[in-house]
Amino acid sequence: MFYMNCHRKGIVFIFIATVFLFISCEQRVDKDKLTITAVMDDIKQEFAPDKRVALFNIEYSRKGNETILKGESNLPEAVASFKQKLAGKNIYYLDSIQLLPSSNLNGFTQGLITISVANLRGRPAHSAELVTQATLGTPVKILKVEDSWYLIQTPDKYLSWVDSGGIMPL
């Protein structure tokens, strides 16, 4: 009886020790994630407090032991500051952050609105929320193209999507 009781306690001890081991290993990942998230929030607050006029969409993920930062921004200073702060905290990562304007625009980073009133959307879809409108001849900055939609920035700095029928890339 005494042997069984000790044996059972041993199994419980091993089980609890294993659980703590897994939790402690997971905390390292969470610590990096918390640090990256905190730095990301600081950068957003400093450089991109209004997502209607500044784009800083970076995501954190892990693949095995590798930290991956993926996303896009139209703010080179914000991305540089973000990378510098992470380096200062000794966080190493695979950099998949794309700076806009996108390189696949082949130099066509300016455009003109070509219809009397272009509806500018929050997402690249006709059913998306109407963000603002632009009138014929309005010059815009083209940041990227996705299917038949262009992500643009208007002269008043608003970011929005316009379909290809409403813009002429220059």
Predicted stretch roles:
Residues M1-R8:
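N-terminal secretory signal peptides that target proteins for export/translocation
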Residues E26-R28:
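Bacterial signal peptide processing site
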Residues D30-K63, A118:
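Gly/Ser-centered flexible loop/linker motifs
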Residues I113-V140:
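Beta-loop motif signature
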